[in-house]
């Protein structure tokens, strides 16, 4: 049970500018067809945070905006409400809800995405008009999914509107995949050289390889990923950090720069020994960062946040669409967060006290 002080401390944990999208999923090779599945970068980020948030107060600290059009399915509203987050629905029945198609093509069964209806972006003014100035001032972490140029605009807007000028906003930035490449390196570096905010950049390994002009192919070994992670050292201001997401290889955290330099730590993927349980990677990266964001907001620990990011992503990729949630038992696909934490630590061999780690996330 959380006391009054804890409730105050956790009421503004994470907010995202990621969108809600209604997804259709087509995987003809396996005769898989799904309609009206909740999706989008914002949705999966919040889901990832929910998987880590075992308490109702923590879940209410997750803030996001869902834009509803005239065709918004009622069953999706019930699904979202069951998660217990601080979701705000904005209605505009003159338009259709943002909709997308996830489809797979080629011999490699490569996942593709396209919008089927116009998208509606979320910016800082939207956050303030929806949640109020006080919530933005108290926010522990801002999850951004956008290009480098838009990230700069959002950071400038945050600094402009924040009432408390003494505290640096913490930005957990997921660069837009198509614009994370060598052609856009200057924009991304401009964000990472900022010293008036704390930025934690998180591209995946394939995007990072393109960012440094190396290759469009995803690195396939941990050694390649570690070499890639080291390239971010001089790319960033000494106070900024990076989480390199490496798919089935897990993640590598690149810390702020200490007197002896940065630290580089590897965290295995949740299903690195149980790959047969991975059915669809859609939303895995977004949910990783949602789990990471809420954990970092609570603990300020890159290690704990990386563990939780991998756990959240592991739950998301176990099915097509979103995981099955039981709000009474607080299980995702039938498993509690505590049991997932125990499983992950036992499989990975990471030396952490489970009780202390769990307590740091549920205080």
Swiss-Prot record:
Domain of life, source organism: Eukaryota
The family this protein is said to belong to: To S.pombe SpAC4G8.14c.
Protein name per the record: Protein MAK32
Pfam families: PfkB
Function text: Necessary for the structural stability of L-A double-stranded RNA-containing particles. Necessary for growth at 37 degrees Celsius as well as for maintenance of the killer plasmid.
Organism of provenance: Saccharomyces cerevisiae (strain ATCC 204508 / S288c)
SUPFAM superfamilies: Ribokinase-like
């Amino acid at each position: 049970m959380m006391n009054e002080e804890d409730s105050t401390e956790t009421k503004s944990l994470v907010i995202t500018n990621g969108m809600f999208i209604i997804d259709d999923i087509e995987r003809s090779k396996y005769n898989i067809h799904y309609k009206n599945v909740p999706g989008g970068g914002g949705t999966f980020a919040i889901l990832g945070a929910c998987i880590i948030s075992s308490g109702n107060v923590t879940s209410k600290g997750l803030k996001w905006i869902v834009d509803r059009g005239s065709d918004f399915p009622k069953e999706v509203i019930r699904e979202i409400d069951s998660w217990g987050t601080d979701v705000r629905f904005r209605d505009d029945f003159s338009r259709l809800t943002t909709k997308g198609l996830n489809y797979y093509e080629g011999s490699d069964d490569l996942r593709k995405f396209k919008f089927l209806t116009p998208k509606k972006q979320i910016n800082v003014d939207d956050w303030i008009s929806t949640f109020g100035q006080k919530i933005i001032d108290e926010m522990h972490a801002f999850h951004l999914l956008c290009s480098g140029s838009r990230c700069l605009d959002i950071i400038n807007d945050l600094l402009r509107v924040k009432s408390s000028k003494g505290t640096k906003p913490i930005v957990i930035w997921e660069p837009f995949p198509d614009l994370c490449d060598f052609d856009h390196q200057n924009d991304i570096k401009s964000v990472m050289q900022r010293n008036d905010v704390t930025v934690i950049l998180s591209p995946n390994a394939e995007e990072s390889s393109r960012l440094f002009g190396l290759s469009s192919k995803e690195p396939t070994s941990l050694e390649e990923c570690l070499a890639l992670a080291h390239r971010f050292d001089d790319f960033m201001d000494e106070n900024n950090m990076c989480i390199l997401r490496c798919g089935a290889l897990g993640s590598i955290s690149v810390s702020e720069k200490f007197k002896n330099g940065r630290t580089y730590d590897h965290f295995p993927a949740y299903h690195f020994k149980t790959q047969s349980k991975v059915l669809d990677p859609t939303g895995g990266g977004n949910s990783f960062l949602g789990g990471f964001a809420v954990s970092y907001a609570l603990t300020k620990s890159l290690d704990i946040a990386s563990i939780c990011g991998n756990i959240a992503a592991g739950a998301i990729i176990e099915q097509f669409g979103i995981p099955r949630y039981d709000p009474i038992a607080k299980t995702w696909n039938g498993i509690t967060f505590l049991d997932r934490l125990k499983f992950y630590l036992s499989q990975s061999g990471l030396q952490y006290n489970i009780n202390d780690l769990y307590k740091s996330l549920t205080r």
